[in-house]
């Protein structure tokens, strides 16, 4: 996969999945717009963006950050402190905050609760640690990753 387009496949799959959920009234999700600095007008955005996606399912607020990576490790520098803190605040207030990973080499999707990253002392997390601490979910026809069963299981615990 070309580095320039890293994350585009994951974003497309997630967008198709949430469109399916929204269309079938199973849940309500949206991709948050990423603020950009205008080169022509010189407008500067002062507030940092929080996470990629927000939504609601069965009365529970949900927020997640989508990350693609390749190789044996995911560098935690790809997660900004304010993003992780935001997800943890969501969890503190009885919502659900998590990470949606795509490992490009294996072409596999993983969902991991944000709290699983809390006490890491290294600057990266190995694919083996992700496999141990996350749930792998499959891509199904027509390009949908059905993550609602995982969300439901976390809500019901």
Swiss-Prot record:
Keywords: Cytoplasm, DNA damage, DNA recombination, DNA repair, Endonuclease, Hydrolase, Magnesium, Metal-binding, Nuclease. Its cofactor is Mg(2+). Binds 1 Mg(2+) ion per subunit. The keyword Phosphoprotein does not apply. It comes from the Bacteria. GO terms for biological process: chromosome segregation; DNA recombination; DNA repair. Mg(2+) binds at residues 50, 52, 65, 83. It is an enzyme of class 3 (hydrolase). It is found in: Cytoplasm. This is Holliday junction resolvase RecU. It comes from Mycoplasmopsis pulmonis (strain UAB CTIP) (Mycoplasma pulmonis).
């Amino acid at each position: 996969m070309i580095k320039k387009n890293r994350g585009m496949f994951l974003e497309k799959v997630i967008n198709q999945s949430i469109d399916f959920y929204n269309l079938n009234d199973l849940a309500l999700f949206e991709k948050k717009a990423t603020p950009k600095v205008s080169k022509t007008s010189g407008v500067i955005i002062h507030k940092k963006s929080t996470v990629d996606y927000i939504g609601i399912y069965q009365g529970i607020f949900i927020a997640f950050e989508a990350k693609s990576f390749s190789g044996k490790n995911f560098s935690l520098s790809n997660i900004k402190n304010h993003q992780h803190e935001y997800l943890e605040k969501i969890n503190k207030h009885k919502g659900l905050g998590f990470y949606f990973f795509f490992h490009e080499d294996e072409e596999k999707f993983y969902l991991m609760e944000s709290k699983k990253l809390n006490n890491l002392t290294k600057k990266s997390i190995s694919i083996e640690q992700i496999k141990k601490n996350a749930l792998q979910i499959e891509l199904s026809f027509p390009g949908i990753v059905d993550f609602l069963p995982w969300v439901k299981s976390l809500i019901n615990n």
